[in-house]
């Protein structure tokens, strides 16, 4: 696989809402054979209020949704401790970062909060603000 494009909650929300920039990035990634992914927890965090359930289901059928396993939460907990961050605020980002760190390279994360994810993901992951 030629890499991974990971969506945080804002990236996924923008995909649900047909944001042109995010749709274009996801389409380009898919055309190049890049795996588009997110975490199961991110799907809960993403904005559902104005999105038809059928659209959410359709989008998620085309995205690799990673289960948040004990192994991932263990790695996320290490990231939180390492960076002195509290799980109450950063748990979902830490889980996504744990997934990003093990995903096929190169890895890009689309996020609205690049500072937190840049810290958690480390230098091998490109973090892009959307």
Regions found by a protein language model. Give the residues of each.
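Short, well-structured N-terminal submotif of metal-dependent ribonuclease cores
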Residues: 1-38, 48-61
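Acidic, PIN/NYN-like endoribonuclease modules and their adjacent C-terminal/linker elements
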Residues: 2-4, 25, 101-130
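Histidine- and aromatic-rich ligand-binding microenvironments
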Residues: 7-8, 38-39, 89-90, 125-130
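A generic structural signal for short hydrophobic patches within well-formed alpha-helices
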Residues: 12-13, 43, 73, 117
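A general structural signal for well-ordered alpha-helical segments in protein cores
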Residues: 22-23, 43, 53-56, 73-76, ...
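Short, hinge-like loop/turn segments at secondary-structure boundaries
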Residues: 53-57, 83, 126-128
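Structural recognition of alpha->loop->beta junctions
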Residues: 59-64, 122
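Active-site neighborhoods of divalent-metal-dependent phosphate/nucleic-acid chemistry enzymes
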Residues: 65-114
